[in-house]
């Protein structure tokens, strides 16, 4: 993967553009036409990564500490936090190496840097794939708990959850290794885009179906108690708003990154696409933001987990 001036992206296989300068302005492409280039300062990028790192470490520690949280659902949430932790940690490591190389504080041979680059690439890609997979696994788990409530504990057992988790990690590591090895092939990038779209469709279908079932249940309760219809409509609106936020955050945080991959395949030399490529670091930052938001959506809404988290924090003091 090529050098990108003084700063080089260790995900250079995905980013064919130089790192942005610390401002927001119009940068010229190779034809001199202006391009909107949004720069993310290194300090902000590292700060967001640190927040994500601390947040997800706390989630993993809380789930590991409390045996009541060793259920399949919390195992998936723990693995989501762990994969998000690796996403933010690998990007922070990448940025730290870039800054050290740029400052001349890290002097090493090119072969060593290349090996480190490949290692971080595999770690980053596998953790991203794991994060997407566990978001889908959580959606499936919630779907089964609602539509097969009486059989849930016989369907989603802890051994099955552990096997699914192991399969996700192994498949993610193997596929990311192949991705790094064959990153110049368009089919590889398209497979990643298709995978993202499949996860998006899966989550949308499952959560919309769950919302429809919840609305039917609420409607049945209102009829039983002879209440007015607006109460049910209010519940439906709240559920729709929650669903929109959930899927909207997922799409807004992950979509630009996979749009970048798709454009690398479809229009690598097009002027408009080249302008989009200049904002690659913004797309990575959005993914880091998603790793910060995930615990707020999936973990911290649990009273049991929050109580354990307070115990962990008190013990650390």
From Swiss-Prot:
Residue ranges annotated as Cytoplasmic topological domain: 64-72, 141-163, 212-240, 301-317
Stretches that traverse the bilayer: 38-63, 73-93, 119-140, 164-183, 192-211, 241-266, 280-300
Glycan attachment sites: 29
Subcellular compartments: Cell membrane
Its membrane topology: Multi-pass membrane protein
GO molecular function per UniProt: melanocyte-stimulating hormone receptor activity
BP GO terms, sorted: adenylate cyclase-activating G protein-coupled receptor signaling pathway
Organism this protein belongs to: Alouatta pigra
Lipid attachment in record (S-palmitoyl cysteine): 315
Subunit structure: Interacts with MGRN1, but does not undergo MGRN1-mediated ubiquitination; this interaction competes with GNAS-binding and thus inhibits agonist-induced cAMP production. Interacts with OPN3; the interaction results in a decrease in MC1R-mediated cAMP signaling and ultimately a decrease in melanin production in melanocytes.
GO cellular component: plasma membrane
Regions annotated as coiled coil: none
Annotated protein name in UniProt: Melanocyte-stimulating hormone receptor
């Amino acid at each position: 993967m090529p050098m990108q001036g003084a700063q080089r992206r260790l995900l250079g296989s995905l980013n064919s553009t130089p790192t942005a300068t610390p401002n927001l302005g119009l940068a010229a492409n190779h034809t001199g036409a202006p391009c909107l280039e949004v720069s993310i300062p290194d300090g902000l990028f590292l700060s967001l990564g640190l927040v994500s790192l601390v947040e997800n470490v706390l989630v993993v520690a809380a789930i590991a500490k409390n045996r009541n949280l060793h259920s399949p659902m919390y195992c998936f949430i723990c693995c989501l936090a762990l994969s998000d932790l690796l996403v933010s940690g690998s990007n922070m490591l990448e940025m730290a190496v870039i800054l050290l190389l740029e400052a001349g504080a890290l002097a090493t041979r090119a072969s060593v840097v290349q090996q480190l680059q490949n290692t971080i690439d595999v770690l980053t890609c596998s953790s991203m794939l794991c994060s997407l997979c566990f978001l889908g696994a959580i959606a499936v788990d919630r779907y089964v708990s609602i539509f097969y409530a009486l059989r849930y504990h016989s369907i989603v057992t802890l051994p099955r959850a552990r096997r699914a988790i192991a399969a996700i990690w192994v498949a993610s590591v193997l596929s990311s290794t192949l991705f790094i090895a064959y990153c110049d092939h368009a089919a590889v990038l398209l497979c990643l885009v298709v995978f993202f779209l499949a996860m998006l469709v899966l989550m949308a279908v499952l959560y919309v179906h769950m919302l429809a079932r919840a609305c039917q249940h609420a409607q049945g309760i209102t009829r039983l108690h002879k209440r007015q219809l607006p109460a049910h409509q209010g519940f439906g609106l709240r559920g729709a708003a929650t669903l929109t936020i959930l899927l909207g955050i997922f799409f807004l945080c992950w979509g630009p990154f996979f749009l970048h991959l798709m454009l690398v395949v479809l229009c690598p030399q097009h002027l408009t696409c080249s302008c989009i490529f200049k904002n690659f670091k913004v797309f990575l930052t959005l993914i880091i933001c998603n790793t910060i938001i995930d615990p707020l959506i999936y973990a911290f809404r649990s009273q049991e987990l929050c109580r354990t988290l307070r115990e962990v924090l008190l013990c650390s003091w």
